[in-house]
From Swiss-Prot:
PROSITE patterns: ABC_TRANSPORTER_1, ABC_TRANSPORTER_2. Its EC number is 7.-.-.-. This is Putative ABC transporter ATP-binding protein VNG_1631G. GO terms for molecular function: ATP binding; ATP hydrolysis activity; ATPase-coupled transmembrane transporter activity. One of its GO terms (cellular component) is ATP-binding cassette (ABC) transporter complex. SMART domains: AAA. Keywords: ATP-binding, Cell membrane, Membrane, Nucleotide-binding, Translocase, Transport. Residues 2-233 form the ABC transporter domain. Probably part of an ABC transporter complex. Responsible for energy coupling to the transport system. InterPro entries: AAA+_ATPase (IPR003593), ABC_transporter-like_ATP-bd (IPR003439), ABC_transporter-like_CS (IPR017871), ABC_transpr_CbiO/EcfA_su (IPR015856), Co_trans_ATP-bd (IPR005876), ECF_ABC_transporter_ATP-bd (IPR050095), P-loop_NTPase (IPR027417). It is an enzyme of class 7 (translocase). Belongs to the ABC transporter superfamily. GO terms for biological process: cobalt ion transport.
Length: 242
């Protein structure tokens, strides 16, 4: 479980999160909706200690986050974060090196797992390619593979479908479905309501730094009130809506 209690965070004079009480149940896919600037990405970055709150607590697995270097290193082995821009994720020259970077940096030498992850994301033929020669969709797959190679307990995704076409978005849906099948607690920040409702077990809407709605689905009329749109999956026939 990931949980926050009266979480507050400001950037300069601007209050970004204002007393947020949030829960992501163990094994669930929790989708965090909100328009641009609502505070979604800021909240997500608190879950693996990239940001420290001004007030309130963040707990992962029932334990409040400690912000010393050793504790944060251990936390980030358990909680993988996939950034919106895959270029922020890629840290090594080639595909294979990038996917293996996280485990090796943590002292984990598991060649079989790395090879399995490379194969899972259909990257075997591109393993020696330079990351800076990849397309946006290919970079996204490498960033997903790099996080999965860490064998995390929790996965956080920030706007994972941004800039992707339909095929790329389906890759993300399949990835999230595989996380759910493996019982990995997943939190996704997005303003793409079609994608979000396709994968969500539970839904939270963040509005102006506060949680404005919780539920297991979201009606189209309510989505419109929050200015949420479906950018790729125009047909909602397979999506549970009220």
């Amino acid at each position: 479980m990931i949980e926050t209690t009266t979480l507050r965070f400001s950037h300069g004079d601007t209050t970004v999160l204002d007393g947020v009480d949030f829960t992501a149940e163990t094994g669930d896919v929790t989708v965090l909706f909100g328009r641009n600037g609502a505070g979604k990405s800021t909240l997500l970055r608190h879950f693996n200690g990239l940001l420290e709150p001004d007030a309130g607590t963040v707990s992962v697995g029932g334990t409040p986050i400690a912000y010393d270097d050793d504790s944060l290193t251990e936390l980030r082995l358990r909680v993988g974060l996939i950034f919106q821009n895959p270029d922020d994720q890629l840290v090594a020259p080639t595909v294979q090196q990038d996917i293996a970077f996280g485990p090796r940096n943590a002292g984990i030498e598991d060649t079989d797992r790395i090879e399995d992850v490379v194969s899972t994301f259909d990257l075997s033929e591109q393993a020696e390619r330079l990351c800076n020669t990849l397309s946006g969709g290919e970079k996204k797959r490498v960033s997903l593979a790099g996080v999965l190679a860490m064998d995390p307990e929790y996965v956080l995704l920030d706007e994972p479908t941004a800039g992707l076409d339909g095929a790329g978005c389906r890759t993300i849906v399949e990835f999230v479905s595989s996380l759910a099948a493996d019982g990995i607690t997943t939190v996704i920040a997005t303003h793409d309501v079609g994608f979000g409702l396709t994968v969500a077990d539970t839904v939270t809407v963040l509005e102006d730094g506060v949680i404005d709605y919780r539920g297991d689905t979201l009606s189209q009329s309510l989505a419109a009130e929050y200015d949420l749109r479906s950018y790729v999956f125009d047909d909602w026939s397979d999506v549970s809506v009220e």
